[in-house]
Structures are given as structure tokens and as C-alpha cells.
């Protein structure tokens, strides 16, 4: 699933290419892609002749205000969603779910192999979270000033779950997923099986700083492409080439040379270095 860096990469690409573009019609090729409204006719009627404002990212959601008081569009890429800015005569992928036609023979396509992705239209004068209810459950953004050490310590205090699972909880920190949880835990020297309540203040401080550093690096690299993620122009992300542990099972640790191990936690694969992330380390 695209995580914060991938969604941020898409957001920045959309702002470069679609800001000020006007929607001149569209086609919904898979009706269940629409989360709201479910009526294809109403959706297309409401967005027709609307102009894209500045795209925003909230957690793993993409939001854009539509000028001319046309409301908002919201998108969640889920597992395999892609937003691609292409020429209208570009060959159509069989996984294309939505087409929004714009000026100069361009269009914004939503391509989604697994079909879990969702698109919302939010009526004017309504906050997006009233329609896209998942927004209400999100925790702080890791780049926000409010994501302080005190906030993070408070969120981990007394927690009986392992730290990897906690980091994946979107109500704690918005946008972190499997890849960057593993990477941040490696950078901070914390084993993913460590319980939240067992972390010392220096460890929490290190983890917070590592999360921010890893996310910034991943954004600079255009995100991670292991299978389906693409930027708005179809370009792959490059972070996998510099990843510390994720996707590197049995390969030597980039720091100490110890083979990277992989275990299952909460149904997800977790990668770590047993040497650099020792059990019971409180420092």
C-alpha cells in the first residue's frame, strides 16, 4: 500500500500538473470506485467544469478543493491505486477505473489493479471529514509541530502492543505503513517486537527523529516501488535502492553485515537486523 512518502510524491506531482486544470467530463469504468456519491450520474454532474485547486495530503488520503464552489474530491489509493496524468489518446490499461477529461487533450486516470481504491466527491460547504469519515480517525502528521516528543511518549505510555503494530495504527501517527515503520525502527535501533510500554524516553526520542528522517529521505527518492506504485507521470520511486531493512530478507545489514531477518507481526512482514536492533536494549 502506498504510504506517506508515496502519497506525498503523488500530491506534489498533481499540484505541478493539474492545478488550474478544468474537468470537462469523465467516465466511471468501475462503479464501486465511487465511495460518495454512489450515483455515477450525480458524481459526473457535480464535478463537470470544476477546476482543480491545490492538492493536499492527509495521512494516506489525497484531497483537492474544486474551484467555482464545486466542493472537494478525495482519493485513497489503498493497495494498488495510481493517479496518472496522461494524454487522452494514451492506450487504456484494463485496470483503469476512472477518467477525468481536462483541457489540451489531457486526462487524470485512476488505475487500480486490486480495485480497493476509493474516490469521493464532497459537496460544497461541507468539511471533507463529514463524507470521508476515515479522516476523523487520523492521528497527527509526523511533520507537524504538534507531533512532539511529549505527544509520542504519551501515545506509547502503558501500551501492551509491540511498537511495530503501534506505528501502523493511523490514530497514533498518520501515514506510516509497513515499509517506513521497519526503516524507522532500524534507524533507532529498536526491535519491532518491543512493547510500547517498554521503550525508554531516549528510545522514543530516537524513534521520533528516525521516523521524520526516513520519511523525508523517502520523499526525496520519490517513494518506494516494489510492485505497483508509480508517480503521476508513471515514474517509479527509488527508495528501495537505499532501504536499510525492508525487502532485504537474508541480505547483509548495510551497517554490520548481519543477515536481515523477517518475521510476521500482526499478519505483516517485519524486517530487522538482530545485531543493530538487539532485544532488551533500553539505551
UniProtKB/Swiss-Prot annotation:
Keyword Glycoprotein listed: no
Single GO BP term: base-excision repair
Lineage: Bacteria, Bacillati, Cyanobacteriota, Cyanophyceae, Oscillatoriophycideae
Zinc-finger ranges (FPG-type): 244-278
Species this protein is from: Crocosphaera subtropica (strain ATCC 51142 / BH68)
Co-factor note (free text): Binds 1 zinc ion per subunit.
UniProt subunit comment: Monomer.
Record keywords: DNA damage, DNA repair, DNA-binding, Glycosidase, Hydrolase, Lyase, Metal-binding, Multifunctional enzyme, Zinc, Zinc-finger
Protein name (Swiss-Prot/TrEMBL): Formamidopyrimidine-DNA glycosylase
A Pfam family recorded for this sequence: H2TH
Catalyzed chemical reaction(s): Hydrolysis of DNA containing ring-opened 7-methylguanine residues, releasing 2,6-diamino-4-hydroxy-5-(N-methyl)formamidopyrimidine; 2'-deoxyribonucleotide-(2'-deoxyribose 5'-phosphate)-2'-deoxyribonucleotide-DNA = a 3'-end 2'-deoxyribonucleotide-(2,3-dehydro-2,3-deoxyribose 5'-phosphate)-DNA + a 5'-end 5'-phospho-2'-deoxyribonucleoside-DNA + H(+)
Record-annotated active site: 2-3, 60, 268
Superkingdom, natural source: Bacteria
Cofactor field: Zn(2+)
Xref: PANTHER family: FORMAMIDOPYRIMIDINE-DNA GLYCOSYLASE
Xref: SUPFAM superfamilies: Glucocorticoid receptor-like (DNA-binding domain), N-terminal domain of MutM-like DNA repair proteins, S13-like H2TH domain
SMART domains named in the record: Fapy_DNA_glyco, H2TH
Family to which this protein belongs: Belongs to the FPG family.
Summary of the function given for this chain in its UniProt record: Involved in base excision repair of DNA damaged by oxidation or by mutagenic agents. Acts as a DNA glycosylase that recognizes and removes damaged bases. Has a preference for oxidized purines, such as 7,8-dihydro-8-oxoguanine (8-oxoG). Has AP (apurinic/apyrimidinic) lyase activity and introduces nicks in the DNA strand. Cleaves the DNA backbone by beta-delta elimination to generate a single-strand break at the site of the removed base with both 3'- and 5'-phosphates.
One Gene Ontology term of the molecular function aspect: damaged DNA binding
Binding site for DNA: 95, 114, 159
The EC number(s) this enzyme carries: 3.2.2.23, 4.2.99.18
Amino acid at each position: 500500500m502506498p504510504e506517506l512518502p508515496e502519497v506525498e510524491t503523488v500530491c506534489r506531482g498533481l499540484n505541478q500538473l493539474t492545478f488550474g486544470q478544468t474537468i470537462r467530463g469523465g467516465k466511471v469504468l468501475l462503479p464501486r470506485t465511487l465511495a460518495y456519491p454512489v450515483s455515477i450520474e450525480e458524481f459526473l454532474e457535480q464535478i463537470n467544469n470544476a477546476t482543480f485547486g491545490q492538492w493536499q495530503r492527509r495521512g494516506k488520503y489525497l484531497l483537492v478543493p474544486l474551484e467555482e464552489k464545486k466542493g472537494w474530491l478525495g482519493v485513497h489509493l489503498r493497495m494498488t491505486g495510481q493517479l496518472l496524468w496522461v494524454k487522452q489518446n494514451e492506450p487504456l490499461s484494463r485496470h483503469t477505473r476512472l477518467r477525468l477529461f481536462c483541457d489540451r487533450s489531457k486526462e487524470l486516470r485512476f488505475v487500480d489493479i486490486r480495485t480497493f481504491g476509493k474516490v469521493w466527491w464532497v459537496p460544497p460547504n461541507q468539511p471533507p471529514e463529514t463524507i470521508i469519515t476515515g479522516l476523523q480517525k487520523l492521528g497527527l502528521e509526523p511533520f507537524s509541530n504538534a507531533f512532539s516528543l511529549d505527544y509520542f511518549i504519551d501515545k506509547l505510555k502503558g501500551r501492551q502492543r509491540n511498537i511495530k503494530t503501534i506505528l501502523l495504527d493511523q490514530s497514533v501517527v498518520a501515514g506510516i505503513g509497513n515499509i517506513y515503520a521497519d526503516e524507522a525502527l532500524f534507524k533507532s535501533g529498536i526491535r519491532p517486537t518491543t512493547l510500547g510500554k517498554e521503550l525508554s524516553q531516549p528510545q522514543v526520542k530516537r524513534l521520533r527523529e528516525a521516523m521524520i528522517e526516513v520519511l523525508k529521505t523517502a520523499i526525496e527518492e520519490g517513494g518506494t516501488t516494489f510492485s505497483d506504485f508509480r508517480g503521476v507521470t508513471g515514474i517509479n520511486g527509488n527508495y528501495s535502492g537505499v532501504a536499510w531493512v525492508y525487502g532485504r530478507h537474508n541480505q547483509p545489514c548495510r551497517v554490520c553485515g548481519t543477515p536481515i531477518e523477517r518475521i510476521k507481526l500482526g499478519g505483516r512482514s517485519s524486517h530487522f537486523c538482530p545485531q543493530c536492533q538487539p532485544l532488551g536494549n533500553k539505551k
